[in-house]
C-alpha cells in the first residue's frame, strides 16, 4: 500500500543498508525523568531540511536561523528491518539492564548522573486501544518504505528491546552501546497515546528526507546525533544556553564519508517523545524541532560528506576527534552580520564560538560524540566549497605574482636611479655595480628563504582542528584511566602526515628552545604579564590569531622579517584562528626615510609576541611592537642629538679660534702648538710565542764548549743568495778578485812555461793542479755567479732566476767564457803537455775589467789603484818582452852571438833586464847581427815607444786627477793673493785670508760645497744634508716640535761658513738677515758698558740671531756683538729662505713666533742680583747693646758714658750713608748700560743669558733723618770698639757726609750726589 512512498522518496546513492538486531528482546519500561549532563558547545550546524513529498497534517513553518541544532533519536518499532533509527541513551532506571560500549576514540569518561537538567525524559506508555493498533500498523508500513539510519559502529551488534504483541506490537530498539557500566540504561516503553506516535513519526521522517546543513569544515566528518541542553554553569562562557523544550526530535542520522569510526559514548540520554498531557509544551517542542529541521545559514567551511541512509540501528554513537582529511591549513575568520552574532551569543551554540579541545587536557572530561551521516546535497556543497577554496588559492597566487611584479618594477626603478647616479659619479661605477650584484643575490636568497619559511610554516601551522560538532561533558575520570579504542587507532593510522607534522613541530620547538633560551624567558615573562589578569583556563582559553597572508610573499624585498615563533601549547586549550592579512603590508612597509635605521629597527624589534594579529592595528601585541620600535627610534634620536650637540660645540670653539686669529694672528695658545706625534711601536708578538722564539734564537746563536759558551751567527745568514747585485754586493767583488787571480795566473805563467824551461817532469803535477784549480774557479763563475746577476730592464731591476739566466746566456761575456774553457787539454794525450794549449784561458779579460770598475767604485782613493794598475800594465809588457827574448835566444842558440842570451845566471831576470833596456831605449846594448835579430829588435823599439808613451801619459792623467783638488785650491789662493796685492790690502788682512783658505781646505777638503751639490738632484742633496747636518739641527731647542719636513727643507738651504778667531759674526745694531747654527767651534756674546764683556759662550748645536730673523718685537736689528772664539764653522740660514719655507708650514711658523716672543719676554725680565757691599756684612747687634744705646741717647751728654755713645751713633750714621750712596751709584750705572744695550738679543740655548735691564728705583733715597733714629736703624757691628777721645766737645757732632738729590738732564731722572767732609772728619778724630 505504501510502496509508492518508497519509490517517490529519495534514496542514498550506492549506500549499503544493513540491519543488525539483537537476539534477545528486552521489555521496555517507562523511563523516569533524569538529569542530563551538561553539554559542551557544538561548533556545528544541522543540515538544511528538504520538503517532503508525502503529505503530513502538521504545517511546516518557514526556515528560521538556528545556530545550534540539538538532534535526538526516536525509538522505532522492530517492523522496520531495512533501516534502523538510533535512539539516544537514556538515564538508567531502577531495576533495568545496562548496555555496555567500548571506550571512546579519544578518551572515555564517566558521566555524572547527579547533574541537573532542564529537560525531562518522556516515558513511553503501553497502548491497548484499537487506534493505537491502527497507528502501529501504519507506522510499520511507513518504516518499510522510509530509509532508516545504520549504526555507525558496524562491527558492534545492536541490541533492540521488543514489545510483546499483545501490547501493541511496536518494538523500541535498545541503544547500540552505552558508556561505563551503570552509567546508562535503555528503556523502550511504548507510548499510550497514538497522536504522540504519529507526531513522532512525522518529525522523524521529515528530518530524514529534509537536507541538513553541512558542518563548517571538512576536517570533521561526522556530527553528534543527539544532545540535551542544560543550563550553563558559572565559569563556562562557551557553553550553550538552556532551552525550554523538554525533548527534541531527531533528524535523520548521517553516515560518515569514509568509514564509521565512532564508538558509543556514555553520558547522554534523551527521549525524542513529546511531553504528555501539556499542549503548550507540545507546541513549543514541535516548533523547536521544526526549527532544527529547517535549513540554517551556512558558514564558509567545508563539511564532511554525508550519505542519507545507513543500514543498522544504533542509539548511541561516537565520532573520531582526529580529522580524517585535512583540506585547509587554518580556520578563516570572516565578518558576519550583527544580528547573526547576537543570535549566536544568545544560543551559545555557534560553531564559530566553539573549538575542539586538544587531546591532552589537565581537567578530566567525558567526551561523547554522536556521528551523523552526510547527504548527497552536502557532498555537492562540499565540492562547491572545495572549488571556492581553490579559487581563493588561485587568487592568492595571483596576488603574490602581482606583488612580485611590483617588486620587480621597484627593482627596475631602483636600477634606473642607480644608473643615473653612476653617470653623475663615474668614479664610483665599479663599486656601485658590485653593490647592486650583492643586493640582487641577497634578494634572491631572501626570496628563497621566504619561500622555504612559508612552506615550513604552512606545514607547521596546519592545525589539527576537529570540525565536527560534539558534546563535551565533564566527568570524574582521570587521564591515566583513559585508553584508546581500535577505531581511534585506525583513524590515527589514516593520518600519518598529521603525526609527522606534529613530531616535526615538537622537534623544531625543542631546538628553538635550546638555541634561544634567553628569548624564551623574555617571552614567557611577557606572556605572564599579559595573562596575569585572565589565566588560560577552560573558562578563558588562549586564542592565537595568525595571519595567513603575512608570509605568503615578501612584502618588501629589502627586508626579511623573521616569522613569529609559535608559542608552546597552553595546558588547557590553544586554538588558532587565521585572519587574512590584507592590510599587513601597511604595518610592515618600510618608508623611504627609514633606510638608514631599517636594519637597526629590524634587529631591535622582531615579532616576539605570542599572539600576532596583523590585520588589527589596535591589538596590544602590535602596540607593544610599535612601542618597541618607537623606543628604538627614540634611542637613535637621542644619540643623534648628542652628536649634534657635540658638533655645535666644536663649531663654536672653531669660530672663536678663527676670531682670535683674525684679531691677533701671532698670538696662539700653547694648546694649538703642534706636538710631535709619538712614533708607533711595532705590534709585539704574543707572549706565548716569545719564549719559543727566544729559545730557538739561543739554540742557533750560542754554542757550548767545554771551557766556555760563545755566540755565533746563525747558519741561515750564510745561505747563498737567489740573486746578486753586482753594484753593491761586496761578496761578489771578493769573488771577482779570485777570478782575476786565476786569470792572472794564466796570463803571466803560460808565457813563462812556454818560453823558459821551468816546467819539468818532476813538477808537472804542481802546474797541472794549479791549472785545473783555475779552471774550476772559471766554471763556478759561469754556473753559479753569472747566472744570478741582477740587471736593469726597462728601468726595473730584474731578480727572476730564469730572466737572469737568459740575460747571461745572451750576453757577449758568456761567449767569451765558453771560449776560455775550451777543453784543449785532451790534446795532451796526443801532443803532450804543451802550455800553449791553455792559451784560451786568457780570454776571461772581461772579468778583469769588471773587477777594476767595481773596486774603483768602493775605494775612497781610487787614483791609487789606477796608478798601481798602470804600473802593472808596464810590468806585464816587459814580462812578455823578456819571454820573447829568451825564446829568440833559444831559437838562435844560447850564447851563439853577443846579442842573444849567453845562459849565465838566472835566465828570467837577465832577460827581463834586457827587455827593460830595450823598451825604454836606454842604449848600451849590443847590436844585432843577423836578420832575425834586426827584425826582432825593430819590433821591440816600436813597441817600447808606443807602450811607454801610452803608459807615461796615463800615469800623468792619474796623478793629475789625484791632485786636481789641491791644484784648484792653489789656483784660487794665488788668484786671491794677486787680487789683494793689486788693491794693496793690508798685510794683516791678507794673512787672515790665507789662513781662511788653508783651514777651509784642510777641514772640508774643498772651498765651496755648493759647487758639488749643484750637480746632484734634490733627493740626493737632501740625503746628504740629513746625514751631515740633521744631527746638529735637531738638537736646536728653537726647532723642537716643528714639522719634520720643514726641517728637511731647511737643511737644503743651509750654507756652511768658516770664521777665523776673533771674527765678528754679527755686530750690535746691524740689520738681521741671517740666523746662525754652530756646527763646530765656539762663539762669544759680548756686552756690558764698553761692549767687550763676555756675557756667554755658545758651543756646537747652539743657535743665535733667531729673534732678528723672525722679526718679533717690532725690529730686526742685532742686539749684541757675537765674536768667533777660534776657528768656527757655522751654518747660515737666510731670512728669505726661511720665509719661503714657513709659507708652506703655517703651524710651524706660529710655533716659532711664539717661542721667539717667550724668549724675548724672558730676556727682558730683570734678574735679582746681589748688590756689591762696600762694608763686609756685620753680625746682628745684641738687644742689650741696643737698649743701652737708646738709654744713652735719652740721657744725653750728662751721663758718664754719654759722650762715647753719641760719638758711636754718629759714626754708624756715616757708615750707613756711605753704603746707601755706593749702592745707588751701582744701580745707576747698570741702568745706563741697560738703556744703551736695550733690546739686546739673547741666545736660544739654555745657558745663554741676555743683558738684563734692572728696574729704576721707584723712590729716590732721602737724606738721613735725625741722628737718633738713624743710629737705631743701623747699629754698629758687635766687633766694633768705640774710639776714646779725651778732648771731645760736649755738644753733638756735625754730620761728615752730605747727600743731595738734584734733577737730571731728563725730566724723569734725578742725580744723587754724596759729599764727604774730610776736614771735619779729621778734626773729629
Curated annotation (Swiss-Prot):
Residues 1224-1230 are annotated as: Calmodulin-binding CaM2. Residues 560-571, 1262-1279 have a biased composition (Pro residues). GO terms for cellular component: intracellular cyclic nucleotide activated cation channel complex; membrane; non-motile cilium membrane; photoreceptor outer segment; rod photoreceptor outer segment; terminal bouton. Pore-forming subunit of the rod cyclic nucleotide-gated channel. Mediates rod photoresponses at dim light converting transient changes in intracellular cGMP levels into electrical signals. In the dark, cGMP levels are high and keep the channel open enabling a steady inward current carried by Na(+) and Ca(2+) ions that leads to membrane depolarization and neurotransmitter release from synaptic terminals. The gene is Cngb1. One of its GO terms (biological process) is visual perception. Residues 1-732, 786-800, 850-861, 961-1325 are cytoplasmic. Gene3D superfamilies: 1.10.287.70, Helix hairpin bin, Jelly Rolls. Rod outer segments. Olfactory sensory neurons. It is a multi-pass membrane protein. Residues 633-643 are annotated as: Calmodulin-binding CaM1. It is found in: Cell projection, Cilium membrane. Residues 964-1040 are annotated as: C-linker. Residues 1038-1142 are annotated as: cNMP-binding domain. Residues 43-81, 380-393, 418-463, 495-517 have a biased composition (Acidic residues). It comes from the Eukaryota. Residues 1226-1250 have a biased composition (Low complexity). The chain crosses the membrane at residues 733-754, 764-785, 801-820, 837-849, 862-884, 908-934, 935-960. Residues 105-121 have a biased composition (Polar residues). Residues 370-379, 518-527 have a biased composition (Basic and acidic residues). Belongs to the cyclic nucleotide-gated cation channel (TC 1.A.1.5) family. CNGB1 subfamily. GO terms for molecular function: calcium channel activity; cAMP binding; cGMP binding; cyclic nucleotide-activated monoatomic ion channel activity; intracellularly cAMP-activated cation channel activity; intracellularly cGMP-activated cation channel activity; protein-containing complex binding; sodium channel activity. It holds the Pfam family cNMP_binding. This is Cyclic nucleotide-gated channel beta-1.
Amino acid at each position: 500500500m505504501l510502496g509508492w512512498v518508497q519509490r517517490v522518496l529519495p534514496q542514498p546513492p550506492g549506500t549499503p543498508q544493513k540491519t543488525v538486531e539483537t537476539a534477545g528482546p528486552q521489555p521496555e519500561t517507562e523511563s523516569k525523568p533524569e538529569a542530563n549532563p551538561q553539554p559542551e558547545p557544538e561548533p556545528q550546524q544541522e543540515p538544511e531540511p528538504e520538503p517532503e513529498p508525502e503529505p503530513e497534517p502538521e504545517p511546516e513553518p518557514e526556515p528560521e536561523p538556528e545556530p545550534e541544532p540539538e538532534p535526538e533519536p526516536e525509538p522505532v518499532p522492530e517492523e522496520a528491518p531495512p533501516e534502523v533509527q538510533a535512539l539516544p541513551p537514556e538515564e538508567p532506571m531502577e531495576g533495568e539492564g545496562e548496555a555496555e560500549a567500548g571506550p571512546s576514540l579519544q578518551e572515555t569518561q564517566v558521566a555524572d548522573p547527579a547533574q541537573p537538567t532542564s529537560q525531562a525524559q518522556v516515558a513511553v506508555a503501553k497502548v491497548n486501544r484499537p487506534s493505537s493498533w491502527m497507528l502501529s500498523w501504519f507506522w510499520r508500513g511507513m518504516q518499510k518504505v522510509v530509509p532508516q539510519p545504520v549504526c555507525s559502529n558496524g562491527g558492534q551488534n545492536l541490541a533492540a528491546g521488543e514489545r510483546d504483541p499483545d501490547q501493541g506490537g511496536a518494538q523500541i530498539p535498545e541503544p547500540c552501546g552505552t558508556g561505563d557500566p551503570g552509567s546508562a540504561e535503555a528503556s523502550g516503553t511504548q507510548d499510550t497515546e497514538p497522536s504522540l506516535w504519529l507526531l513522532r513519526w512525522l518529525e522523524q521522517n521529515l528530518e530524514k528526507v529534509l537536507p541538513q546543513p553541512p558542518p563548517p569544515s571538512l576536517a570533521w566528518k561526522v556530527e553528534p546525533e543527539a544532545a540535551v541542553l542544560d543550563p550553563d554553569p558559572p565559569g563556562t562562557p562557551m557553553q550553550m544556553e538552556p532551552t525550554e523544550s523538554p525533548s527534541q526530535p531527531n533528524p535523520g542520522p548521517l553516515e560518515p564519508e569514509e568509514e564509521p569510526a565512532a564508538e558509543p559514548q556514555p553520558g547522554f540520554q534523551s527521549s525524542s517523545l513529546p511531553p504528555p498531557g501539556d499542549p503548550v509544551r507540545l507546541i513549543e517542542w514541535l516548533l523547536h524541532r521544526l526549527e532544527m529541521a529547517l535549513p540554517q545559514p551556512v558558514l564558509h567551511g567545508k563539511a564532511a560528506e554525508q550519505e542519507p541512509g545507513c543500514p543498522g540501528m544504533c542509539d548511541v554513537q561516537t565520532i573520531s576527534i582526529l580529522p580524517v582529511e585535512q583540506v585547509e591549513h587554518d580556520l578563516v575568520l570572516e565578518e558576519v552580520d550583527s544580528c547573526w552574532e547576537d543570535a549566536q551569543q544568545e544560543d551559545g551554540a555557534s560553531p564559530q564560538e566553539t573549538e575542539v579541545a586538544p587531546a591532552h587536557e589537565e581537567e578530566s572530561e567525558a567526551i561523547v560524540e554522536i556521528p551523523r551521516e552526510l547527504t548527497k546535497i552536502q557532498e555537492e556543497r562540499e565540492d562547491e566549497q572545495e572549488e571556492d577554496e581553490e579559487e581563493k588559492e588561485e587568487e592568492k597566487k595571483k596576488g603574490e605574482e602581482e606583488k612580485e611584479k611590483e617588486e620587480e618594477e621597484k627593482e627596475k626603478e631602483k636600477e634606473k636611479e642607480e644608473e643615473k647616479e653612476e653617470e653623475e659619479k663615474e668614479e664610483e661605477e665599479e663599486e656601485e655595480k658590485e653593490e647592486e650584484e650583492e643586493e640582487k643575490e641577497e634578494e634572491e636568497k631572501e626570496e628563497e628563504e621566504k619561500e622555504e619559511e612559508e612552506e615550513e610554516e604552512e606545514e607547521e601551522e596546519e592545525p589539527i582542528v576537529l570540525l565536527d560538532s560534539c558534546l563535551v561533558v565533564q566527568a570524574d575520570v582521570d587521564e591515566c584511566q583513559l585508553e584508546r579504542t581500535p577505531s581511534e587507532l585506525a583513524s590515527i593510522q589514516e593520518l600519518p602526515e598529521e603525526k609527522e607534522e606534529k613530531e616535526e613541530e615538537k622537534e623544531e620547538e625543542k631546538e628553538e628552545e635550546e638555541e634561544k633560551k634567553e628569548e624564551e624567558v623574555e617571552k614567557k615573562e611577557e606572556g605572564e604579564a599579559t595573562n596575569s589578569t585572565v589565566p588560560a583556563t577552560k573558562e578563558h582559553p588562549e586564542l592565537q590569531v595568525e595571519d595567513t597572508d603575512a608570509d605568503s610573499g615578501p612584502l618588501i624585498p629589502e627586508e626579511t622579517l623573521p616569522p613569529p615563533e609559535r608559542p608552546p601549547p597552553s595546558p588547557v586549550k590553544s586554538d588558532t584562528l587565521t585572519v587574512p592579512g590584507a592590510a599587513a603590508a601597511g604595518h610592515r612597509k618600510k618608508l623611504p626615510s627609514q633606510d638608514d635605521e631599517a636594519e637597526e629597527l629590524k634587529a631591535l624589534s622582531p615579532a616576539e609576541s605570542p599572539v600576532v594579529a596583523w590585520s588589527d592595528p589596535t591589538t596590544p601585541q602590535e602596540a607593544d611592537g610599535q612601542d618597541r620600535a618607537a623606543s628604538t627610534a627614540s634611542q637613535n634620536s637621542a644619540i643623534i642629538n648628542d652628536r649634534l650637540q657635540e658638533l655645535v660645540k666644536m663649531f663654536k670653539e672653531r669660530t672663536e679660534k678663527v676670531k682670535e686669529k683674525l684679531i691677533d694672528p701671532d698670538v696662539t695658545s700653547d694648546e694649538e702648538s703642534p706636538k710631535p706625534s709619538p712614533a708607533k711601536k711595532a705590534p709585539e708578538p704574543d707572549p706565548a710565542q716569545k719564549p719559543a722564539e727566544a729559545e730557538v734564537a739561543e739554540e742557533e746563536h750560542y754554542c757550548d764548549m767545554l771551557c766556555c759558551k760563545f755566540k755565533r751567527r746563525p747558519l741561515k745568514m750564510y745561505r747563498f743568495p737567489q740573486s746578486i747585485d753586482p753594484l753593491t754586493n761586496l761578496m761578489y767583488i771578493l769573488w771577482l778578485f779570485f777570478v782575476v787571480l786565476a786569470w792572472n795566473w794564466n796570463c803571466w805563467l803560460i808565457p813563462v812555461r812556454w818560453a823558459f824551461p821551468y816546467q819539468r817532469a818532476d813538477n808537472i803535477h804542481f802546474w797541472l793542479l794549479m791549472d785545473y784549480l783555475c779552471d774550476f774557479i772559471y766554471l763556478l763563475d759561469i754556473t753559479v755567479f753569472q747566472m744570478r746577476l741582477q740587471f736593469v730592464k726597462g728601468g726595473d731591476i730584474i731578480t727572476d732566476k730564469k730572466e737572469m739566466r737568459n740575460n747571461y746566456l745572451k750576453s757577449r761575456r758568456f761567449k767569451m767564457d765558453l771560449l776560455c774553457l775550451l777543453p784543449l787539454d785532451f790534446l795532451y794525450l796526443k801532443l803532450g803537455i804543451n802550455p800553449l794549449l791553455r792559451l784560451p784561458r786568457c780570454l776571461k779579460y772581461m772579468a778583469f775589467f769588471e773587477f777594476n770598475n767595481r773596486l774603483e767604485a768602493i775605494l775612497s782613493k781610487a787614483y791609487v789603484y789606477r796608478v798601481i794598475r798602470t804600473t802593472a800594465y808596464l810590468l806585464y809588457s816587459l814580462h812578455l818582452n823578456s819571454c820573447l827574448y829568451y825564446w829568440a835566444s833559444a831559437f838562435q842558440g844560447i850564447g851563439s852571438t853577443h846579442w842573444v842570451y849567453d845562459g849565465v845566471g838566472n835566465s828570467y831576470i837577465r832577460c827581463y833586464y834586457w827587455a827593460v833596456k830595450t823598451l825604454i831605449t836606454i842604449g848600451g846594448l849590443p847590436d844585432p847581427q843577423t836578420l832575425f835579430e834586426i827584425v826582432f829588435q825593430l819590433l821591440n823599439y816600436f813597441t817600447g815607444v808606443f807602450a811607454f808613451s801610452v803608459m807615461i801619459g796615463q800615469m800623468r792623467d792619474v796623478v793629475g786627477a789625484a791632485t786636481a783638488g789641491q791644484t784648484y785650491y792653489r789656483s784660487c789662493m794665488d788668484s786671491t793673493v794677486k787680487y789683494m796685492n793689486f788693491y794693496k790690502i793690508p798685510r794683516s788682512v791678507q794673512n787672515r785670508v790665507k789662513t781662511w783658505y788653508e783651514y777651509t781646505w784642510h777641514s772640508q777638503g774643498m772651498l765651496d760645497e755648493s759647487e758639488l751639490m749643484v750637480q746632484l738632484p734634490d733627493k740626493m742633496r737632501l740625503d746628504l744634508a740629513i746625514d751631515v747636518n740633521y744631527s746638529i739641527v735637531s738638537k736646536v731647542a728653537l726647532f723642537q716640535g716643528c714639522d719634520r719636513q720643514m726641517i728637511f727643507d731647511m737643511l737644503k738651504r743651509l750654507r756652511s761658513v768658516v770664521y777665523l778667531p776673533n771674527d765678528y759674526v754679527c755686530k750690535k745694531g746691524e740689520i738681521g738677515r741671517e740666523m746662525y747654527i754652530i756646527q763646530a767651534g765656539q762663539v762669544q756674546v759680548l756686552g756690558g758698558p764698553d761692549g767687550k764683556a763676555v756675557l756667554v759662550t755658545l758651543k756646537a748645536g747652539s743657535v743665535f740671531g733667531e729673534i732678528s730673523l723672525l722679526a718679533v718685537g717690532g725690529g730686526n736689528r742685532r742686539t749684541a756683538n757675537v765674536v768667533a772664539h777660534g776657528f768656527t764653522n757655522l751654518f747660515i740660514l737666510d731670512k728669505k729662505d726661511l720665509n719661503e719655507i714657513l709659507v708652506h708650514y703655517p703651524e710651524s711658523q706660529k710655533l716659532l713666533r711664539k717661542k721667539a716672543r717667550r724668549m724675548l719676554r724672558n730676556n727682558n725680565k730683570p734678574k735679582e742680583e746681589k748688590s756689591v757691599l762696600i762694608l763686609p756684612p756685620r753680625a746682628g747687634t745684641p738687644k742689650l747693646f741696643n737698649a743701652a744705646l737708646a738709654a744713652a741717647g735719652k740721657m744725653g751728654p750728662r751721663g758718664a758714658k754719654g759722650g762715647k755713645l753719641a760719638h758711636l751713633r754718629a759714626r754708624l750714621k756715616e757708615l750707613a750713608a756711605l753704603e746707601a750712596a755706593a749702592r745707588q751709584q751701582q744701580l745707576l750705572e747698570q741702568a745706563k748700560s741697560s738703556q744703551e744695550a736695550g733690546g739686546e738679543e739673547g741666545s736660544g740655548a739654555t745657558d745663554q743669558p741676555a743683558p738684563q735691564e734692572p728696574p729704576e728705583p721707584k723712590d729716590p733715597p732721602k737724606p738721613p733723618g735725625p741722628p737718633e733714629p738713624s743710629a737705631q736703624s743701623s747699629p754698629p757691628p758687635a766687633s766694633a770698639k768705640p774710639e776714646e777721645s779725651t778732648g771731645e766737645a760736649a755738644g753733638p757732632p756735625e754730620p761728615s757726609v752730605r747727600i743731595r738729590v738734584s734733577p737730571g738732564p731728563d725730566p724723569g731722572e734725578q742725580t744723587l750726589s754724596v759729599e764727604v767732609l774730610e776736614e771735619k772728619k779729621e778734626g773729629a778724630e
